[in-house]
Structure formats: C-alpha cells, structure tokens
Amino acid sequence: MFKDFFNRSKKKKYLTVQDSKQNDVPAGIMTKCPKCKKIMYTKELNENLNVCFNCDHHIALTAYKRIEAISDEGSFIEFDRGMTSANPLDFPGYEEKIEKDQQKTGLNEALVSGTAKLDGIQYGVAVMDARFRMGSMGSVVGEKICRIIDYCTEHRLPFILFSASGGARMQEGIISLMQMGKTSVSLKRHSDAGLLYISYITNPTTGGVSASFASVGDINLSEPKALIGFAGRRVIEQTINEKLPDDFQTAEFLLEHGQLDKVIHRKDMRETLSNILKIHQEVSN
C-alpha cells in the first residue's frame, strides 16, 4: 500500500490553465494593410473607401462597395446576377474552385454589372472583383460585359468598366481568349454610336484583360500605384535581357508614357466620374 502511494506521487500531473490573454476581438473587426502592415478598424477603413490611413495604399474594394461609392443611393439595378460558369474543357477541379469562390465571396462570377445613376445621370457599369478566381475573364465575364455594353448602346448610355484581373481564365482555354475579341466588338459598336466608354483600371490588371477592353477606353483612368501590364516583370526582363525601371507597370509609369489620361485618388473617384458624365451629357444634348 505504501509502495503504491510513493509510486503514484512520482507520476507527472498536468493542469490546464485558461489563457487570460485570450483574443476576444470578433473576426473582421480589424484589418491589416497589406503594404505597411498597420492594423485598423475595418469600419473606419470602409468609411475611408479602403484607403490606408498610414501609407495611403489603395486596398481592394469589393464590386458592390465600388458601385455603392459611385452611384446614387438605391439606383443600382443588377443585370444577369444568376449567370455561372460551366466547365467546357472538363478541366479537373474547376467546378470545385468555382463553388469555393462563390461561397467565399457571395458572388456567382468575377464581375458585377448593371445600370446606376450618379448625380442623377444614368450610366452602365461593370466591376470586376479579384476575390473571385483573381478576377480572371472566362465565358461568363465576357458575356456579362457584352450584354451590359449592348444595353448601353441600345439605350444610349455612357459605360464605365472597372478592371481588376489576372487575365484570361486558363481553365476555359480558347473560349476565355475569345472574350478579348468579343468584348472589343461590343465596345466598337458602342463607340460607333457616339457614346462614352470610361475604362477605370485598378490593381492588378494584367494579361488578356489589360490587352483588350481595359486599354481601349475613350478615357483611361487608374488608381495610384496600380499594377497594370500584360506579361510579368520577370518574364520581360528575361526576354529582353535588361533590368526594368522600378516603377515599370505602375499607373504612374503608364501615365508618364501616355497610356493613361489620369491617375485618381480614390477619394476623388466619385467627383471625377460625375464631372466627366456631366460634360458628356451636355455635349450629347
């Protein structure tokens, strides 16, 4: 009996202690700037249009937040919300990836389109959302863009398109690449009707999107420090065997070389677009 008592006393005993410093902050209440790493209240950041208070970095806006920022309250009417991608090439795992992004973002595809009013002026709008398959352009994205452009042409409306994309969607192969020409044809009809197309290029816009509808606006605008280009920086450097400038493929570089009309801080986005639409309306009338 005594022997058992002493044997028991030699066994290690553990006690679970509750962490007094347990994180009680609800998920989503704070946001970290991806550039300077400053942590900010999400609510205050949203009120500042997702622009970092510390370094002025323009953090991505969701498609609906972007539309809300540039339209009169309650004026947005969404088109083709239910359209979703098929898997024409039977690409392995594609349906699962689409489903995952749908659950994560609440979107059916990488673009939201429709009509809205800004200071009473009606216009067509399409906004790419890079959270969904990196904003890549597949058959649904191309079709939705063409439908809203054709609607604007028929109803003689100006059109604004916000690009944010990694390019053509590889899982759809040539069908994805076809959207470059398809959207350009719709834009040509819109242009031939004497209507205004504003291309607003945001970070990042690359690949087939930068080489098609994003670059052919009557007015091409962008946000500070936005990454805009076709091929990646490393690919270009290896191809030409030269070191590229530090600001290569930024909005400021493109502005300096005549490929953009203006780089606009997000706080000035609404006012700038409103002024352009008002001028266009006066000239059209």
From Swiss-Prot:
Zn(2+) binds at residues 33, 36, 52, 55. Its main location: cytoplasm. GO terms for molecular function: acetyl-CoA carboxylase activity; ATP binding; carboxyl- or carbamoyltransferase activity; zinc ion binding. Binds 1 zinc ion per subunit. GO terms for biological process: fatty acid biosynthetic process; malonyl-CoA biosynthetic process. Its cofactor is Zn(2+). Transmembrane segments: none annotated. Its EC number is 2.1.3.15. Keywords: ATP-binding, Cytoplasm, Fatty acid biosynthesis, Fatty acid metabolism, Lipid biosynthesis, Lipid metabolism, Metal-binding, Nucleotide-binding, Transferase, Zinc, Zinc-finger. Pfam families: Carboxyl_trans (PF01039), Zn_ribbon_ACC (PF17848). It is found in: Cytoplasm. Pathway: Lipid metabolism; malonyl-CoA biosynthesis; malonyl-CoA from acetyl-CoA: step 1/1. Residues 29-285 form the CoA carboxyltransferase N-terminal domain. It comes from the Bacteria. PROSITE patterns: COA_CT_NTER (PS50980). NCBIfam families: accD (TIGR00515). PANTHER family: ACETYL-COENZYME A CARBOXYLASE CARBOXYL TRANSFERASE SUBUNIT BETA, CHLOROPLASTIC. Component of the acetyl coenzyme A carboxylase (ACC) complex. Biotin carboxylase (BC) catalyzes the carboxylation of biotin on its carrier protein (BCCP) and then the CO(2) group is transferred by the transcarboxylase to acetyl-CoA to form malonyl-CoA. Belongs to the AccD/PCCB family. This is Acetyl-coenzyme A carboxylase carboxyl transferase subunit beta.
